[in-house]
Swiss-Prot record:
Main location: cytoplasm
Similarity annotation: Belongs to the RecA family.
Recorded superkingdom: Bacteria
Protein's UniProt name: Protein RecA
Gene Ontology molecular function, alphabetical: ATP binding; ATP hydrolysis activity; ATP-dependent DNA damage sensor activity; damaged DNA binding; single-stranded DNA binding
Disulphide bridges, residue numbers: none
Free-text function comment from the UniProt entry: Can catalyze the hydrolysis of ATP in the presence of single-stranded DNA, the ATP-dependent uptake of single-stranded DNA by duplex DNA, and the ATP-dependent hybridization of homologous single-stranded DNAs. It interacts with LexA causing its activation and leading to its autocatalytic cleavage.
Subcellular location: Cytoplasm
GO biological process assignments: DNA recombination; DNA repair; SOS response
SMART domains found in the cross-reference section: AAA
UniProt xrefs under Pfam families: RecA, RecA_C
Length: 353
């Protein structure tokens, strides 16, 4: 078959497919504009946005945030919700754990009056609600907190102690098969928070695994492994926050295995001033000599905690340094990358103030 005949045969096949399955069921990838631009939602931590390679979490995709207890999973997801709202979007929170604190969410920046929340009775209801919200096309981000709390209906109806093998894994697999296509069409970002468990009898390798089976690992475009690596001390030597390390364990949209570190403060959430300070030092915008920090040959102060508070107070200085960081990023076109091993939970260490 020569080239003109092949083109005619292809055009006839495409016409028949569109007639059979509807317009847009098959198209040229290059002409499909949605493939060229990926809409994202910022995470609240600039260092993590850079590690993701696309300056945020993508819309229309499944995201998994997993880690041990008190590692900042819910805080990170809540910041994504707050940033989606700041962009004019609508957010929904499926609180399967029944543990969302409205006052803390409001402190982070969430407009709780506009936040849609659901506290379903069982896992099937939670995932059905998520699918219906995504299908509406009116929701920008849906947070499911958490996968471990999505209890199958048959398990709820049984007695404590009954053995239910693979129920949750089958439920997640069935739901994600339906949900992923809906999310892509509606450009809704689904953020699944997950817990970790220990595999029994593992002598070599990492014994940690996540709940809900393998389906979520496969369907996730991005998986974030979040760990607490130290505590942050205030001027009176009391704990005021945690130092957090996030490894991009999977990334379908940029190179994976990048690592980002940032501060989560108890009364603030993710510290944007701390992120700016760390990146400014990394890009030599702020010079660090011992415990002193200098900017344009002027002393900003002594101690990381003092300088972070100074950047938080002085909004003009904060924005000036932030602009210079973005200029460096644009010039280099390479995000901050730290190749490292999988972050493991380590004994708490003190971050020097």
């Amino acid at each position: 078959m020569n080239l003109p005949d092949r083109k005619k045969a292809l055009e006839a096949a495409v016409a028949y497919i569109e007639k059979q399955f509807g317009a847009g069921s098959i198209m040229s990838l290059g002409r499909h504009s949605a493939t060229h631009e990926i809409s994202t939602i910022k995470t609240g931590a600039l260092s993590l946005d850079l590690a993701l390679g696309i300056h945020g979490v993508p819309k229309g995709r499944v995201i998994e945030i997993f880690g041990p207890e008190s590692s900042g999973k819910t805080t990170l997801a809540t910041h994504i919700v707050a940033n989606a709202q700041k962009m004019g979007g609508v957010a929904a929170y499926i609180d399967a754990e029944h543990a969302l604190d409205p006052s803390y969410a409001s402190l982070i920046g969430v407009n709780i009056d506009d936040l849609m929340i659901s506290q379903p009775d069982c896992g099937e209801d939670a995932l059905s609600i998520a699918e219906l919200l995504a299908r509406s096309g009116a929701v920008d981000v849906i947070v499911i907190d958490s996968v471990a709390a999505l209890v199958p209906k048959s398990e709820l109806e049984g007695d404590i102690g009954d053995v239910h093998v693979g129920l949750q894994a089958r439920m997640m697999s069935q739901a994600l098969r339906k949900l992923t296509a809906t999310l892509s069409r509606s450009q809704t970002c689904a953020v699944f928070i997950n817990q970790i468990r220990e595999k029994i009898g593992v002598s070599f390798g990492n014994p940690e695994t996540t709940t809900g089976g393998r389906a979520l690992k496969f369907y996730s475009s991005i998986r974030l492994d979040i760990r607490r690596i130290g505590s942050i001390k205030g001027s009176d030597n009391s704990d005021i926050g945690n130092r957090i390390k996030v490894k991009v364990a999977k990334n379908k949209l940029a190179p994976p295995f990048r690592i980002a570190e940032f501060d989560i403060l108890f009364n603030e959430g993710i510290s944007s001033a701390g992120c700016i300070l760390d990146l400014a030092v990394e890009y030599n915008i702020i010079e660090k000599k011992g415990s002193w920090f200098n900017y344009q040959e002027k002393k900003l102060g002594q101690g990381r905690e003092f300088v972070r508070e100074e950047l938080k107070r002085n909004r003009k200085l904060f924005e000036e340094i932030e602009k210079r960081i973005y200029d460096v990023i644009a010039a280099n076109k390479t995000p901050s990358v730290h190749a490292n091993e999988t972050p493991q939970e380590v004994p708490a260490q003190t971050v020097e103030a």
